[in-house]
Amino acid sequence: MIIWLAELLQPYFSFFRLFEYLSFRAIVSILTALGISLWMGPRMIKRLQMLQIGQVVRNEGPESHFSKRGTPTMGGVMILAAITITVLLWADLTNPYVWAVLAVLLGYGAVGFVDDYRKVVRKNTDGLIARWKYFWQSAIALVVAFALYAHGQDTAATQLVVPFFKDVMPQLGLMYIVLTYFVIVGTSNAVNLTDGLDGLAIMPTVLVAAGFAAIAWATGNVNFANYLHIPYIPHSSELVVVCTAMVGAGLGFLWFNTYPAQVFMGDVGALALGGALGTIAVLVRQEFVLVIMGGVFVMETLSVILQVGSYKLRGQRIFRMAPIHHHYELKGWPEPRVIVRFWIISIVLVLIGLATLKVR
């Protein structure tokens, strides 16, 4: 919106030329989203407390979590509000990639909202029935996948980029739709599984979003794309503003979500943020790098798959509890230790993921 106003006013006030620079809009995007989150936080927490919208804690979980019962949840609403407002203000709204990410963010946010509402307001511990949750996640992902394929068919936007191999970029064809579907749905659920401790999911999300901001900038710059031997995708540079909005909103939420948490994001936040990260990874053609940078999400998901598979096949559990962050809690690790160590792992993995762009 502001970039449009800047174009109108630039002939009269040269100052407005500043708003056309991507670097400037990326910085103010972080600050805007951060400011909105910090402003909304206390007000939303107070409102959630008044409405008695509190976290439901399973009796079979770690005993240390019993004290979390009743902590306000559905705080992801303020994350989505901060991101959406910021993107509408600072992004180029003629860019289709911006709308693709917003569609997934808000669509998955709606699915998560219904799930949370049923859990904490209707007191239905199961929330939204699993098959319906999966149905709506799938429907949104497939609509976006088909739209993106139609928009970028047989161009660099539908190539598969393999780390460490600069000349391996095959056209995916219709497999692009399949890959996009699994990346969006898979990342959404992976982030949701990770969201089990105070700040555990939001900080890796912020780090991965920051990593993708750098990748989007390189992918949308023909000189850097050629230098790094990655596809040049003209529309992708505008995703920098979306990524930095996610960084700012995430940091603002972390202010209230850090241990001991004053509010939890709930499924409304976790499903939406995961879906948005998956969509961004697809748009910049770095699905494999997402697996690396989002290694904490992958680890949490694999721990659940291995736990369930082992129990069904052998009747034995591999971990004391899954996802794996609960395993370490039951081993006696204090919650802050688990959280910070997972953050450190995320920092290292994001740096490794960025390094793969050059190691070819």
From Swiss-Prot:
Keyword Manganese belongs to the record: no
EC number, UniProt record: 2.7.8.13
Catalysed reactions, semicolon-separated: UDP-N-acetyl-alpha-D-muramoyl-L-alanyl-gamma-D-glutamyl-meso-2,6-diaminopimeloyl-D-alanyl-D-alanine + di-trans,octa-cis-undecaprenyl phosphate = di-trans,octa-cis-undecaprenyl diphospho-N-acetyl-alpha-D-muramoyl-L-alanyl-D-glutamyl-meso-2,6-diaminopimeloyl-D-alanyl-D-alanine + UMP
Cell compartment(s), UniProt: Cell inner membrane
Pathway where this protein functions: Cell wall biogenesis; peptidoglycan biosynthesis
GO terms of biological process kind: cell division; cell wall macromolecule biosynthetic process; cell wall organization; peptidoglycan biosynthetic process; regulation of cell shape
InterPro entries linked: Glycosyl_transferase_4, PNAcMuramoyl-5peptid_Trfase, PNAcMuramoyl-5peptid_Trfase_CS
GO function terms (MF aspect): metal ion binding; phospho-N-acetylmuramoyl-pentapeptide-transferase activity; UDP-N-acetylmuramoyl-L-alanyl-D-glutamyl-meso-2,6-diaminopimelyl-D-alanyl-D-alanine:undecaprenyl-phosphate transferase activity
UniProt keyword annotations, A-Z: Cell cycle, Cell division, Cell inner membrane, Cell membrane, Cell shape, Cell wall biogenesis/degradation, Magnesium, Membrane, Metal-binding, Peptidoglycan synthesis, Transferase, Transmembrane, Transmembrane helix
Cellular compartments per GO CC: plasma membrane
Ranges annotated as spanning the membrane: 21-41, 73-93, 94-114, 132-152, 168-188, 199-219, 239-259, 263-283, 288-308, 338-358
Origin superkingdom: Bacteria
Entry membrane topology: Multi-pass membrane protein
Enzyme category, top tier: transferase
Disulfide bonds: none
Keyword Transmembrane helix: yes
Cofactor(s) the record lists: Mg(2+)
Free-text function comment from the UniProt entry: Catalyzes the initial step of the lipid cycle reactions in the biosynthesis of the cell wall peptidoglycan: transfers peptidoglycan precursor phospho-MurNAc-pentapeptide from UDP-MurNAc-pentapeptide onto the lipid carrier undecaprenyl phosphate, yielding undecaprenyl-pyrophosphoryl-MurNAc-pentapeptide, known as lipid I.
Family: Belongs to the glycosyltransferase 4 family. MraY subfamily.
Record-linked NCBIfam families: mraY
Designated name of the protein: Phospho-N-acetylmuramoyl-pentapeptide-transferase
Gene source species: Vibrio cholerae serotype O1 (strain ATCC 39315 / El Tor Inaba N16961)
Lineage: Bacteria, Pseudomonadati, Pseudomonadota, Gammaproteobacteria, Vibrionales
